[in-house]
Amino acid sequence: GSFVIRRPDSAVLKFAPISSIADIQRCFEFRTNVESKAAHLAALRRTPEQLAQIRHCYDLIDEANARQMLATEEDYRLHLAITEAASNHYYYTVLKSLHESIKEGMNLTRNLSLMAPKERLRLVQDEHLAIVEAIAEQDGERAEAAMRSHIDKARHRMFEGTR
């Protein structure tokens, strides 16, 4: 026999909007755990095409940075491409459902940073490069550690004004 699976309404997959600083903290905490494991799996499972997409997203951030733009959407797309390369649709779906919350956090981090914008952009892109290189080299442990470090540092930049 055959059966039909009905996909849940997209509204079901949306998280509650960020309504406080505590919500932003919780989102960072959640992302640290989800995205670091996704990066680990992406390093082990990515296809050459997925790696090319990850690199393309990284390059788009560089291009936006050169134009001195915030690159929030490009940054989000890089993270999304990494979850897609994990080849587990749950990681991708969760990150997709957090789109607005993640962008709010990224915008706040960029706008509240005490660092000079160019310096901050370079640091963030260096963190991204560490993740991309680990995924390219299929080093799951290093990819996981690099993603965890990246999200933790973003949280520190926002809440503590540190690098």
Where are these regions (language model features)?
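Short regulatory "switch" loops immediately downstream of catalytic or recognition motifs
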Residues: 6-8, 106-113
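Short helix-coil transition/hinge motifs at the ends and kinks of transmembrane helices
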Residues: 13-17, 110-119
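Short linear motifs at protein or domain termini
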Residues: 1-34, 40, 44, 163
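A late-sequence structural motif
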Residues: 118-146
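Conserved amphipathic alpha-helical segments that form helical-bundle/coiled-coil interaction surfaces
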Residues: 27-109, 127-130, 145-156, 161
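Short secondary-structure boundary micro-motifs
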Residues: 1-2, 10, 66-67, 116-119
